[in-house]
Structure formats: structure tokens, C-alpha cells
């Protein structure tokens, strides 16, 4: 009788082990299938972004890129420039250590797990940035709202010398102030759309026509920002930080063009997806073979 009881216990133990192993294998298979579907979705979204870039005419963007030659030629190393950036006293609270402002469907600074991150480096006076944003921002907003992407915005202001009134710095400071004092990221994306609108973005150099703070303020309010926030957005609170960004960012070799006229230098606009740099010059070539 005792032997029968022991045998029954052994059989039960073996059955439990087999059941546990089967459950583990099933869970592993389900996880692998989930990861496969996730990677397929990520690949599809990345491809969609690239198709948009090609469709808007990468030629137009590429040939209107701007290179920050002064800061790139600086004798500071990228490590020294990074250290100086971290030492800036009035750093925006929402940006990461490399200057990125992350937006997702969950708000500022909250990454959607599994969604690819699209990073855009821009200057508000840069004509290539205008070409890019005029066609891309609406789609990016839809992808953000759907939780399909995380959007990582990097504001720069090295093109002040191509305006008569520090337009790049004033616009970038206003955008950062907006993000810091208005919790709705859609207001910032709408502000970008309006700032880069063809009937608003000024031309550069000798064709530049002065844009007042009040004109920029109107774009903020039209984007859903309160008058109280808009009124206080022009103190250039983050100028020291922007100056440090303009020195550090162009020295990041992972952002350098890998071909074309601007090879081995950083330009605006720059686009990365999950940290991978997408060379606008190569997108131009892609456009040639797909048109």
C-alpha cells in the first residue's frame, strides 16, 4: 500500500514537471511571437517614416541643409563640450543630457515601450528644416497620438548670424519655454507646424525680414498655448544652454553625414530612428531610383 502511494506521488510529480515545462515552452513561444510582431510593426513604422522623407523630396531638404562650421571647427573635444553642457545652470528640466525633448502619447519624457524613437535636429531659420516639417509634422503627430512612435526633438540656434535679430535663438527659447510651461505636447508640435509654415518662416541672409516676438507669440497662442505662458516665453531663459548645445551637438560623430558635400559634418535637419542616422544624401539617391 505504501509502495503504491510512493508510485502515485512520483507519477504526480512527473506530471507536474511536464505541465510546468509545457507551460514554460508555451509562454516562451508566445513571447517570441509577440516580439516578432513587435519587430514587424517597428519595421513598418520605420519604413513609413522613410517613405515620407523620400516622398517630400529629400533633394529639397538636402540642398537646403545648414552646417554649423564655427562650432564644429572649435578646438573643444566632444567630451569637453558635453561636460560644459552639463554645467549650464539653467538647463530645461524636460530635456535629456544630450538635449533631446521626448514626446509620446503619454506626454513629455515618457517613452512608449516598443515604439521606435524618431529624433529630429532643427534650427527654426533652416530652410531644409522648414521643408521637412511642413510635410512631416502632421504625420508625426498622428503616429505619436497612436503610440506608434516616440518623438525626440532637438532644438538648435546656430543660424542667428543669418538673421538681423537672433531669430533662431528667440524661436528656440520660446519653443523650450512652451514645453516647460505647457503640459500638452500637441501644442508644441502645432507650434512647430506654424513656425515652419511657408507663409511664416522667414528667409535667411539678405532676404531675411525681421520677425518680432509678438509675431511668434501669435503663433504660440494659435497653437493652443495660454496667453499667460506666451507672454513670458521671450526672456531667452535658456540661451546659455542653447549656446552649449550648438557647440556640443555638431561634434557628435554619430550625427555626421556619411556621404555627399557635407560628409563628416553635422547639418540641420538631421533625422535619426532608434539612434540610427539617416543620410539625406542617400535618400536623394533613393528618390532618383524610385521616381
Predicted features and spans:
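Terminal targeting segments of Actinobacterial cell-envelope proteins
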Residues: 1-40
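Hydrophobic membrane-insertion alpha-helices, especially the h-region
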Residues: 46-57
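Ser/Thr/Pro/Gly-rich low-complexity linker/stalk segments immediately outside membranes or between
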Residues: 64-77
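Short active-site neighborhood of thiol/selenol oxidoreductases, capturing the structured segment around
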Residues: 112-125
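Structural alpha/beta surface segment adjacent to cysteine/selenocysteine redox centers
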Residues: 130-213
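Thiol/selenol-based redox catalytic cores and closely related redox-interacting motifs
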Residues: 175, 179-278
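Conserved small/polar residues in nucleotide/adenosyl-binding loops
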Residues: 289-290
Amino acid at each position: 500500500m505504501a509502495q503504491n502511494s510512493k508510485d502515485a506521488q512520483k507519477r504526480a510529480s512527473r506530471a507536474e514537471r511536464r505541465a510546468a515545462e509545457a507551460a514554460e515552452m508555451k509562454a516562451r513561444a508566445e513571447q517570441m511571437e509577440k516580439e516578432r510582431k513587435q519587430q514587424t510593426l517597428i519595421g513598418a513604422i520605420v519604413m513609413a517614416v522613410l517613405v515620407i522623407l523620400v516622398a517630400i523630396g529629400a533633394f529639397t531638404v538636402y540642398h537646403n541643409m545648414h552646417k554649423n562650421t564655427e562650432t564644429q571647427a572649435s578646438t573643444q573635444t566632444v567630451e569637453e563640450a558635453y561636460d560644459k553642457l552639463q554645467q549650464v545652470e539653467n538647463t530645461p528640466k524636460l530635456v535629456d543630457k544630450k538635449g533631446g525633448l521626448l514626446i509620446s502619447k503619454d506626454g513629455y519624457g515618457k517613452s512608449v515601450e516598443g515604439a521606435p524613437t524618431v529624433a529630429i535636429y532643427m534650427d527654426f531659420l533652416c530652410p531644409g528644416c522648414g521643408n521637412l516639417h511642413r510635410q512631416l509634422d502632421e504625420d508625426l503627430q498622428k503616429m505619436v497620438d497612436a503610440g506608434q512612435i516616440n518623438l525626440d526633438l532637438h532644438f538648435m540656434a546656430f543660424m542667428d548670424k543669418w538673421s538681423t535679430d537672433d531669430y533662431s535663438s528667440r524661436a528656440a527659447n520660446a519653443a523650450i519655454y512652451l514645453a516647460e510651461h505647457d503640459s500638452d505636447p500637441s501644442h508644441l508640435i502645432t507650434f512647430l507646424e506654424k513656425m515652419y509654415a511657408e507663409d511664416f518662416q522667414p528667409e535667411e541672409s539678405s532676404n531675411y525680414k525681421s520677425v518680432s516676438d509678438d509675431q511668434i507669440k501669435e503663433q504660440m497662442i494659435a497653437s493652443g498655448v495660454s496667453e499667460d505662458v506666451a507672454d513670458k516665453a521671450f526672456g531667452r531663459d535658456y540661451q546659455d544652454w542653447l549656446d552649449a548645445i550648438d557647440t556640443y551637438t555638431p561634434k557628435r560623430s554619430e550625427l555626421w553625414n556619411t556621404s555627399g558635400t557635407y560628409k563628416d559634418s553635422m547639418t540641420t535637419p538631421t533625422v535619426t530612428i532608434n539612434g540610427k542616422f539617416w543620410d539625406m544624401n542617400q535618400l536623394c539617391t533613393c528618390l532618383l531610383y524610385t521616381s
